[in-house]
Amino acid sequence: MDDLKNFRKLGSLTPGHPEIETPGVDANTGPLGQGVGMGIGMALAEKASSNSSLKRFTYILAGDGDLQEPIALGASTLAGHWKLSNLIMFYDKNDIQIAGNTCRVDTTDYAKLYDAMGWHVQEIDGHNHDEIRLSLKNAQSSDKPSIIIGKTIIAK
């Protein structure tokens, strides 16, 4: 909790972007969809270079503002086409982005869109830990890239 209290403070483990000091975080890209494209590129590189029988996964954490960006959607189309089964994106769907409520600017049904792009789609209660664990397990056994749409309430 102390790390979250230091959000966006110099030297914290929860910095602003683009800093990579937090262990396990290879890229902290902020909004505008660059993180989605970067994560898809990392998953492609891992899949192409892996000599191991162990399946490794690339995880993307994205919000409403990220998926509204064309760069994220273009990269997502490629991930579906390439069947990047080692890619799991958690989409925190709280219906809020930097300019306010998403309904003012975006009515996209991302579950339908990602399904059409060849992704394994799951919609869950993003506050329910059991649903999160089960959705991750299901995603790890899919032969497609996975998007877990966690419906959340901001700051809950």
Model-derived features: positions:
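Phosphate/pyrophosphate-binding betaalpha-module
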Residues: 81-91, 95-112, 117
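Glycine/aspartate-rich loop-and-adjacent alpha/beta segment that forms the canonical ThDP
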Residues: 112-115, 120, 129-156
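Acidic, glycine-rich active-site loops and adjacent beta-strand->loop/helix elements
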Residues: 11-13, 59-69, 92-97, 127-129, ...
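Hydrophobic alpha-helical scaffolding
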Residues: 31, 65-66, 100-104, 122-129
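Cofactor-binding active-site loop characterized by glycine-rich and histidine/acidic residues
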Residues: 1-82
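A short alpha/beta connector and helix-capping loop motif
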Residues: 69-94, 132, 147-150
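Short acidic, glycine/serine/threonine-rich loops at helix termini
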Residues: 18-19, 70-74, 98-104, 133-136
